[in-house]
Amino acid sequence: MAKQTPLYQQHLADGAKMVDFHGWMMPLHYGSQLDEHHIVRREAGIFDVSHMTIVDLHGARTREFLRYLLANDVAKLTQPGKALYTGMLNASGGVIDDLIVYFLTEDYFRLVVNSATREKDLAWIEQHAAPFGIEIREREDLALVAVQGPQAQEKVQAILKAKGLSDADVAAVASMKPFFGKQAGDFFVATTGYTGEAGYEIALPNEQVVDFWQQLLAAGVKPCGLGARDTLRLEAGMNLYGQDMDEGISPLAANMGWTIAWQPEDRQFIGREALTHQREKGTDQLVGLVLTEKGVLRNDLPVRFTDSDGVMREGVITSGSFSPTLGVSIALARVPLGIGEQAIVQIRNRELPVHVTKPGFVRAGKAIVQY
C-alpha cells in the first residue's frame, strides 16, 4: 500500500492526478503540467515534497561525523542555518544519495535526503554514526512544501506574518541569502529549491500543513505536481537521483565535481581514495544537449560523436524532455571525454544533430544557454 502525505486529501480536492512515486501517492499534475511549469517560472507555485526524508543529527561529534560521511565539507558551515549540497558516497566513489545538510548548532545538523533512497540512506548513516555517538532522529512529524517562483518569497512572508510570527522572525526570513535555513516559530524556512527559481522549502508540523497550503492557494499560489517539478529541475540542470547518478556513478561523471571538497588534504571521507584515482584517470562527463529540430530527447537514447582522433564515441541521455521555457527539447547526457559542440542522437530511425552545452539551460526564468 502506497503511503500518503498529510496533503493527500487536499490534492484530491484540488483535482490532482495521483501516481505512485517510489511508494508514495503523489500528484503528477492538477490538470496541466505545462501551465504549472510556466506559473513557477512567471509567478509562484507550491509543491508537496513531504515524501522527502528529514533527518536530524544530534551529538557533540556531529560535525566530525559529517566530515567523514559526506564528500563536501561541513567545516565550511560556520554560520547557523547555512546549508551545503553534497553527495554521500560509497567506498568506490559511487553516489548513495545527494542531499542538503544544514548547520543549526554545533551539536545539531539537519539532512534532507531523497524519498526513494530513504531506507538505504538511514541504514548507511546509522552504520557509520555508531562510533561517533550520534543520535539520529527521522522527523516523520514534519511535512515539507516547496514554494517556488519570482513571487514565492513575498507570498510566503505575508502568510508567515498573518500567522502571527514576529516582525523579527519575518524580517530574518526575508533577509536570508540562498542556501540558508531558519526556524521561525513552528516553520523551518529554507532558501533552497529544485526549480532554478527563487523560493522557499518549508518544513512544518504535519497537522498545520493543510491550512498553510490553503492559505497559499488563497494568496494566488498554484499547486504543482511532479511532472512540472521534473521539467523545471531539468531546465535548471539539476540532477535526479537514479537517472543522472546512482551508486555506480562517480560524482565526477555527474556534474557534481564542485561538491567534492578536496581540501584539506588530510580530511578522510568515504570514497576519497576512489575519487582520487578517478580524477587522475579521467571519467565520463555530464553535458547538456539541445535539439532544435522536431523531436523529443528521451532518457536512454544513445548520443554519438566523433572525437579529435576520428573515433566514434557513444554516450547516453540520462534525463530528457521538451523544455516549456525554451520551446525546444533538452537533455542531460553522460558521454566520454572529448565531445565537441555537436553530436548525433538517434530517435527511432532518425539521426538528429544536437548542440552540446553545459548542463544547465534556464535560471530565474531566463535562458542561460546558447545554441
UniProtKB/Swiss-Prot annotation:
GO biological process, one term: glycine decarboxylation via glycine cleavage system
Alphabetical list of SUPFAM superfamilies matching this protein: Aminomethyltransferase beta-barrel domain, Folate-binding domain
GO molecular function: aminomethyltransferase activity; transaminase activity
Keyword set includes Transferase: yes
E.C. number(s) listed in UniProt: 2.1.2.10
One Pfam family cited in the UniProt record for this chain: GCV_T_C
UniProt xrefs under InterPro entries: GCS_T (IPR006223), GCS_T_bac (IPR022903), GCST_C (IPR013977), GCV_T_N (IPR006222), GcvT/YgfZ/DmdA (IPR028896), GcvT/YgfZ_C (IPR029043), TrmE/GcvT_dom1 (IPR027266)
Catalytic activity reported: N(6)-[(R)-S(8)-aminomethyldihydrolipoyl]-L-lysyl-[protein] + (6S)-5,6,7,8-tetrahydrofolate = N(6)-[(R)-dihydrolipoyl]-L-lysyl-[protein] + (6R)-5,10-methylene-5,6,7,8-tetrahydrofolate + NH4(+)
Residues annotated as signal peptide: none
Superkingdom of source: Bacteria
Keyword terms: Aminotransferase, Transferase
GO cellular component: cytosol; glycine cleavage complex
Family note: Belongs to the GcvT family.
Subunit structure: The glycine cleavage system is composed of four proteins: P, T, L and H.
Matching NCBIfam families: gcvT (TIGR00528), PRK00389.1 (NF001567)
Function: The glycine cleavage system catalyzes the degradation of glycine.
Protein name per the record: Aminomethyltransferase
